[in-house]
Amino acid sequence: INAIMGKVEEYKKDFNIQPYQWPEKFGIEPPKIKRYMPDTDDEFPNHVDVLDYETARRFLVGFLYLDDNSKGQTVFDNQDGASFDCKRGSLVLFPPMWPWIHRGEKPVLKPKYLMRLPLL
């Protein structure tokens, strides 16, 4: 958790987040490990991570990649097609609302594993 919080602090610096833009106290939703299998329709189509009352508390989401996988990137369609490779130990942080529509492409050769970590 300390390493993840260190990356969150980097995110805040990179985007010049001011104290009035960040909650004084926050937590992390229970982590969820996701597995996507190759040679199946295992992928996650375009979506956002805040859809209803229950998920509206999320203000930042992290994907921690648990393995190396050259295929199965996370793609942000409305951010100039930015994509992030599945590289073990890498962490992608992004706001969960509608401007950050993203998808998880399906892996090709081996399973893809990631941990989802929404901040509340």
Mark where each language-model region is.
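Fe(II)/2-oxoglutarate oxygenase catalytic core
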Residues: 1-91, 99-120
